[in-house]
Amino acid sequence: METKGYHSLPEGLDMERRWGQVSQAVERSSLGPTERTDENNYMEIVNVSCVSGAIPNNSTQGSSKEKQELLPCLQQDNNRPGILTSDIKTELESKELSATVAESMGLYMDSVRDADYSYEQQNQQGSMSPAKIYQNVEQLVKFYKGNGHRPSTLSCVNTPLRSFMSDSGSSVNGGVMRAVVKSPIMCHEKSPSVCSPLNMTSSVCSPAGINSVSSTTASFGSFPVHSPITQGTPLTCSPNVENRGSRSHSPAHASNVGSPLSSPLSSMKSSISSPPSHCSVKSPVSSPNNVTLRSSVSSPANINNSRCSVSSPSNTNNRSTLSSPAASTVGSICSPVNNAFSYTASGTSAGSSTLRDVVPSPDTQEKGAQEVPFPKTEEVESAISNGVTGQLNIVQYIKPEPDGAFSSSCLGGNSKINSDSSFSVPIKQESTKHSCSGTSFKGNPTVNPFPFMDGSYFSFMDDKDYYSLSGILGPPVPGFDGNCEGSGFPVGIKQEPDDGSYYPEASIPSSAIVGVNSGGQSFHYRIGAQGTISLSRSARDQSFQHLSSFPPVNTLVESWKSHGDLSSRRSDGYPVLEYIPENVSSSTLRSVSTGSSRPSKICLVCGDEASGCHYGVVTCGSCKVFFKRAVEGQHNYLCAGRNDCIIDKIRRKNCPACRLQKCLQAGMNLGARKSKKLGKLKGIHEEQPQQQQPPPPPPPPQSPEEGTTYIAPAKEPSVNTALVPQLSTISRALTPSPVMVLENIEPEIVYAGYDSSKPDTAENLLSTLNRLAGKQMIQVVKWAKVLPGFKNLPLEDQITLIQYSWMCLSSFALSWRSYKHTNSQFLYFAPDLVFNEEKMHQSAMYELCQGMHQISLQFVRLQLTFEEYTIMKVLLLLSTIPKDGLKSQAAFEEMRTNYIKELRKMVTKCPNNSGQSWQRFYQLTKLLDSMHDLVSDLLEFCFYTFRESHALKVEFPAMLVEIISDQLPKVESGNAKPLYFHRK
């Protein structure tokens, strides 16, 4: 005797349109574990009943283990009204109907099994005639008609039961052609009942006996709900949802659905996983041949637990499994509005490619059976929109993944997947243009998850900005006027709250630092392979950072007066300064004490992990000691090779001569000292508190339960005695001078990318120098953009000044590097490109190299300081203008006059120039005048190689091509006007 258990799940009214949202009521019929025989071993009845209402929070209609949470991707508004208006039958009547259908299906399954067995016996002799199968179906129909007891309340046109059988002659190599059925809602001509399960049985079997489809439907009241295998649409549903029917695929696409195995020898219950189509994921492949499975992967609506049989691993593509996108579109979930187990409705798909695939059969046509077309979905090209809401609601593919959490697979929504969900594997949403997020179904506007990736704010990341002066310069930013309210950050980047830190660049990661210059400043340029430079911060944040970060002195005074008990506050382990306001964070104290961001961790000599900045260069401890011993010991090392040995962590001790040469090329100098930012302010912090205050007593013992470090309170200074002189000193220290600004914005030395393996021909050397000049010009443009006062000029004047002075700036910087790194013995173009006498001759510009070398020797004679060099460099930027003048000539004259005054002031402050300041100022200005004569010769040679670049095989980067193309006609026409200090 069979024992049948029914498990009811809640289900909404509009199952067709709200398949993925409403709760479901699925009744399953299962046999007792002790009474399974060969006849009922694979029998399963799936009846679906509809229950009105939305999703209840606490449902009591079924076991809680049978509930299935809805997918976040398919979640919709629960307040949408249902579309059915018919009355709903009680659940008791549904159970009685299910029991009747179960008994009826037993006879039907026996009939189909007999047909399958007969095929196995006749398969060796030939194909089985479909007449016998057709007669079995007619007998079943008569049986159902005789046992009909409940008419349907739906009024529709009666349609005879039709089945379509394909001929065995159309099978090639065992491949069976496709058998299709138009709709599972098929009624007998003489029966007044419509959509009753007694009139709804359709059996489709191909002559090869592999593909057979059975479907069962149930009519509850006036709303027929079908099994997911033969999903249909009643007449009361929306007209834009087409009737669905069972689809029996060929062996290359699908397996038997809802039918027993064609051969009892390969019967089994375990599901298999097919590599081509991922039919099931619960168990491994059991047999490469005919396998019958019991699918364990349910649909999102939890009603697709139907029986499937698979012919071969390559054919395991049935409806009840989640198949891969490449193998099938039947198992893919199409839309939360349209049924998840049926094809897309042709009436609602705009632009979708839907074809009618009809397979002709001679034998069937002889028997009078009509061919019923079935929509064959080839490819979904556009999203299917609901006729009511117009929302995009396609999730094209559901892909089983072996790992990962399901909650991270879909976007949007607050729904969670219950542990009792019938999905046994996570579902991954494919990143296609039809993919959906939770916000799409709720009608919310789509939000860009990456708002800062606008593209217009990253001017340095565009191709036009790599080689465009106007693109790099951009609109003006807050300059030297001390405007603290300027928006240094672009609109597309989130601004961090100002915590009063003096140096925002202290938060830049050390990976962004390329190195330090001879003065010790760290710069945060990233240099790419093509010579392009991208900043770690936005390019529009390159204005003078000190001005926008220093709070005004009067603001500090007001904050100090408002906090009387300055000494009673506690810091986070750092000493408390008497006059530091309370709102200054510990990060400010760290930035003041350190003075600059942490240097890079890579040694610039051998590539080992750097221990700090030694002798002006970020190096490791080994190279530091080696350089000190080599220079102080005055060793004369000789290279056994060609002075191009590889110096790295492993081979740095092989050749001391090449190692010392690389140390010099990196800029190591025994006299170099790393300058600290706000060094004067640091000295004030270290000296004045110690002079005015007695040493504090030792801190009290720390309690074991407390984790704070106690700082002894310092004596509060008197407002009339101590605070006033300190305020005057602080105000002077917090007011940055232009010289301090120029020191901090000085760019880093770039590498030329010189390939020592190539011969040192004139073509190779000149091409390398041009590429280096292109990289340096990008730095010059970025340096000019943050130059105090330069952004006050119109953009046209900025571009004109850079175009006229680029050669002068490059040669002057070359002389400075040669002076600092080689004491003007060589031309220090880059750390990897140093010209000696031999390379000067090989470059075909020996006389020009000698002229630049003479400028470097003048630096040695004058013992030029870094402060003087930075101001003179700005004056060279402002030393050549058009004959007709600039667009804003008054602003240009004012800026140039201010920097001349700064140079005069710097010369006067220098202690070595006491009594001789005017003489030194004269020498420095004469040196600036001599640069014009050298630059005129350099430009003449550059223009010649630029014209004959193809013949000479000399390469020019795009930045130089733009500058030279604009500058060449102006210079040759005599439009350039150099500005001299000592000439008329």
Swiss-Prot record:
Residues 231-329, 347-373, 684-710 are annotated as: Disordered. Gene3D superfamilies: Erythroid Transcription Factor GATA-1, subunit A, Retinoid X Receptor. Progesterone binds at N770, Q776, R817, T945. Residues 726-964 form the NR LBD domain. Changing H7Q: In a colorectal cancer sample; somatic mutation. Changing K953A: Slightly reduces aldosterone binding and abolishes transcription transactivation. Residues 1-602 are annotated as: Modulating. Pfam families: Hormone_recep (PF00104), zf-C4 (PF00105). Residues 603-668 bind DNA. Residues 782-785 are annotated as: Important for coactivator binding. Composed of three domains: a modulating N-terminal domain, a DNA-binding domain and a C-terminal ligand-binding domain. This is Mineralocorticoid receptor.
